[in-house]
From Swiss-Prot:
Chief localisation class: secreted
Gene Ontology MF annotations: cytokine activity; cytokine receptor binding; hormone activity
UniProt source species: Ovis aries
Origin organism lineage: Eukaryota, Metazoa, Chordata, Craniata, Vertebrata
Gene: IFNT6
PANTHER family: INTERFERON OMEGA-1 (PTHR11691:SF37), TYPE I INTERFERON (PTHR11691)
Protein name, UniProt field: Interferon tau-6
Pfam short name (any one): Interferon
InterPro entries: 4_helix_cytokine-like_core, Interferon_alpha/beta/delta
Tissue: Constitutively and exclusively expressed in the mononuclear cells of the extraembryonic trophectoderm.
PROSITE patterns from the UniProt entry: INTERFERON_A_B_D (PS00252)
Gene Ontology CC annotation, any one: extracellular space
Similarity comment: Belongs to the alpha/beta interferon family. IFN-alphaII subfamily.
Amino acid sequence: MAFVLSLLMALVLVSYGPGGSLGCYLSRKLMLDARENLRLLDRMNRLSPHSCLQDRKDFGLPQEMVEGDQLQKDQAFSVLYEMLQQSFNVFHTERSSAAWNTTLLEQLCTGLQQQLDHLDTCRGPVMGEKDSELGKMDPIVTVKKYFQGIHDYLQEKGYSDCAWEIVRVEMMRALTSSTTLQKRLTKTGGDLNSP
């Protein structure tokens, strides 16, 4: 009995370690969470986007980078994680609480956090030594600049209802792109530890 228990413990440790893959499999649940987050964002619509046309802005979504094949697997994972983290940061603020239906906002933040938690199981093994060697990766800097532009826009517009509506629509674009990136990673086997 002790031998079987030891063997099971060793299997678990190997599977979740840098050489294993169980902790880094991009599951179907991650995709379902992504779809649910998009559905919630759609339901958060309070204003007609047409009534806010004067507030439109091109935030410069790095769509080609996110949806194209420019990124290596570890970079793609990092970009996906950063996009979800920054999306969470946009909606997890005191100012966003005043703009949206609290229940839908909480559900969206919970859904984004669940996606991040799932990806966190991969973060160490995937990022590991490569991240420290690369320092600040250009794709991550691009994503951060994109989201900084969104934060700056909200502040510039005084967090108005129209500004939030424009950002909601933009976040739907961003999360749709991140879902495309998730699909691409899943097609590569979803196992982000594989070579």
